[in-house]
Amino acid sequence: MRNIFLRGVSVVSKDSRLMIAVALVVLLQTSVCLLLAAETKSGTTISLQELIELSLDYNSKNKASNRYLPPEHITFIVKKYFYQIETQVEQLDMAKEIRDHFQKAVEKSEEIFESGEGDVSQADLAKLKLGLSNTLNNIIDLEHDIQIGKLNLGKLINKKIRDVSDIAVTDPIPIDFPHTSFDDYLIAKNLTPLAKKVAGKVGIFSNEIHAEQPTKLTEENRLLLYKAYLGVTSSKDKVILGKKNRKITRALLVSEVANYDFGIGDSQELFEALVMYTRVFSSYLDSIYNLNVSAAELTKLTDSIYTRN
């Protein structure tokens, strides 16, 4: 009887230890998952401004070496890589959408061609396949360029960027540039002489009214700023035009895809709509990138003039 009791106690003891061990394993796994989730979540919160601050902090530690760069130059480079990644991520999403349309069109065209009951020719099928191949090639190039952009950006902040989700990229948005003229920009940046001479009543003496002392602007610097300003305004005009063209080609693409799905469309017209939308939308995104980078370059030049003075 005693042996039976002891064996029962032993079994209960073993079961208790097993349950405790299992509980500890589950607790450990949960803790690890929470830590990984927290790390991943924190990685997605790095905004453009935070990237700039991190890069400036890391750059300041290199003052004693030849790797140090002026702060305005670092800020410009960070913005350039950030805008590049932001643009190419959107272009990649668009390319994947076009890839799906091409794949679906190729499969349907092959069925029609093999059945011999439709108007799809060998040439039509070849064009769709070439369009698909070209889109797949674009996807490879964009994924490569995004990887390079992450490496370059990570080098500036001295931190590895593992994935695009580590930085807070959004849909590319044209930067707000409210200045209506170059003189308006110079006044806003206090780069225009504001001192005026007012002649006295007798015309012999003159009084000088001084406003806030403006930053000196040489003719050479004025020319550099004006060229950069023109780059911003021309890019802004292209963004406006590209936005209109994108809406037109998007509507055309939706119409051609729907027609082809219902069996009333033409493979040649679908091919042209896919190619046209790819070109127009990609060009529109490039125009946003060029505008944002041009504005960043103008800011860099302006800040460098402040620094020299």
Give the ranges of each region predicted by the language model.
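Short segments within alpha-helical structural elements
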Residues: T87, N134-K159, G231, R246-S304
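Acidic, low-complexity, intrinsically disordered peripheral segments
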Residues: R2-L6, L34-E50, N152, L156-A168, ...
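Periplasmic alpha-helical coiled-coil/stalk elements that build and connect Gram-negative outer-membrane
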Residues: H73-L194, V198, G231, Y277
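Bacterial N-terminal signal peptides
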Residues: A21-S31
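N-terminal secretory signal peptides that target proteins for export/translocation
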Residues: M1-D15
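Sec/SRP-type N-terminal targeting helices
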Residues: N62-T75, K96, S121-A123, K127, ...
